[in-house]
Design a protein with these regions (language model features):
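Conserved hydrolase catalytic core segment
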Residues: 138-170
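Sec-dependent signal peptide cleavage junction
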Residues: 22-36
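Bacterial N-terminal signal peptides that target proteins for export
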Residues: 2-12
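Active-site acidic short loop of glycosyltransferases
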Residues: 47, 69, 97, 133-139, ...
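A conserved amphipathic alpha-helix that caps or lines the catalytic cleft of carbohydrate-
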Residues: 92, 132, 155-156
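Conserved HGGG/HGGXW glycine-rich cap/lid loop of the alpha/beta-hydrolase fold
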Residues: 51-111
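Active-site loop/oxyanion-hole signature of alpha/beta-hydrolase fold enzymes
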Residues: 103-141
Length: 170
């Protein structure tokens, strides 16, 4: 009975490894002229690293969008979401052919640094504005969830030239 369990265990392990490799193979690809997919990007905002997940048609570097004229959808998470990227991933994947998508992981969320500054609405929006500037995003549609709605409304008020549209999800 012990040999049988070991054999089953090996088969299950190999199957899991195979599933993992095949499931993640879309992340391992050669860089072409343009590509539809996902890129993980770190930018420096006010001396800290902020993580962004980019979905859509990316340029050869994978760092920016290939179709600059396409509407950019910026997604902001609810309070306490441990990984905004994972949280918004299914939605981003369903919309990435129609939009350039940026999932923002604000300081203290996901793979971004812990915030050095207080988490006030003004500070969070100043950081978001700096992130958009760093990415060269002049206008976007904000998609906000829960508490980010408060940040988003304040962002619209303080940076109206940057906001093309506003979507609140709860």
């Amino acid at each position: 009975m012990g040999r049988y369990k070991k054999r089953i265990s090996r088969i299950v392990t190999i199957a899991m490894l195979f599933t993992f490799l095949v499931g993640n193979s879309n992340m391992v690809y050669a860089m072409g002229a343009t590509q539809v997919g996902y890129a993980s990007k770190y930018i420096t905002v006010k001396g800290n690293n902020m993580h962004l997940a980019l979905y859509g048609k990316l340029d050869a570097s994978g760092e920016t969008f290939a179709e600059e004229g396409k509407t950019t959808l910026v997604m902001m998470p609810a309070l306490g979401v441990p990984s905004p990227h994972i949280y918004f991933k299914p939605l981003a994947q369903s919309l990435d052919e129609s939009f350039n998508i940026v999932i923002v992981e604000p300081f203290g969320y996901g793979l971004s640094d812990v915030a050095a500054m207080d988490r006030t609405v003004d500070n969070i929006n100043s950081e978001l504005n700096a992130a958009l500037d760093t990415m060269g995003i002049k206008q976007c549609v904000l998609l906000v969830h829960s508490i980010s709605g408060v940040y988003g409304l304040n962002f619209v008020q303080n940076y109206p030239e940057k906001v093309k549209g506003f979507i609140a999800v709860d």
